[in-house]
């Protein structure tokens, strides 16, 4: 019983395809993993509206008169939920644009007072 020419041609073609496929696949080939996404850069912009930080200015005027008086809830609620760095950036921006009416020389002190009074810390190495 003989195999027909068409079937024989089909089998030869199939064998050639299998040979070609396995002949070109290297046994040690590995898939290169995707590189990890870049680390999230610390933003240098305030995620909140800087003009709203004007409510913190009235408290800064009272610091010299009544030491220990906490800033208004409005002021602290603006930085609530922000990381220390983000809160520092927001207050620094507000201080630099004179929204809070602080002399440039007193900006680092005012920034520290506001952040600490609202339960935040000035990040290490942060310069306003």
UniProtKB/Swiss-Prot annotation:
* Entry keyword Disulfide bond: yes
Residues spanning the signal sequence: 1-23
Localization annotation: Secreted
Q: Which Pfam families match?
A: Hydrophob_seed (PF14547)
Chief place of localization: secreted
Q: Which UniProt keywords apply?
A: Disulfide bond, Secreted, Signal
Q: Which SUPFAM superfamilies match?
A: Bifunctional inhibitor/lipid-transfer protein/seed storage 2S albumin
Matching InterPro entries: Bifun_inhib/LTP/seed_sf (IPR036312), Bifunc_inhib/LTP/seed_store (IPR016140), Hydrophob_seed_dom (IPR027923), Plant_LTP/defense-related (IPR051636)
GO cellular component annotations of the record: extracellular region
Per the UniProt entry, the disulfide pairs are 34-90, 46-76, 56-75, 92-128
Keyword ATP-binding (UniProt): no
What PANTHER family does the database record attribute to this sequence? PTHR31731
Family designation: Belongs to the plant LTP family. PEARLI1 subfamily.
Q: What is this protein called?
A: Putative lipid-binding protein At4g00165
- Upper lineage ranks? Eukaryota, Viridiplantae, Streptophyta, Embryophyta, Tracheophyta
């Amino acid at each position: 019983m003989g195999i027909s020419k068409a079937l024989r041609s089909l089998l030869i073609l199939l064998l050639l395809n299998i040979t070609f496929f396995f002949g070109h696949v290297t046994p040690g080939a590995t898939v290169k993993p995707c590189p990890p996404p870049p680390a999230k850069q610390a933003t240098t912009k305030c995620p909140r509206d800087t003009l709203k930080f004007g409510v913190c200015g009235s408290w800064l005027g009272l610091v010299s008169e009544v030491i220990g008086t906490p800033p208004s809830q409005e002021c602290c609620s603006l930085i609530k939920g922000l990381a220390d760095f983000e809160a520092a950036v927001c207050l620094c921006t507000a201080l630099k644009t004179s929204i809070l009416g602080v002399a440039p020389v007193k900006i680092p002190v005012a920034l520290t007072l506001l952040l600490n009074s609202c339960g935040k810390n000035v990040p290490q190495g942060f310069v306003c």
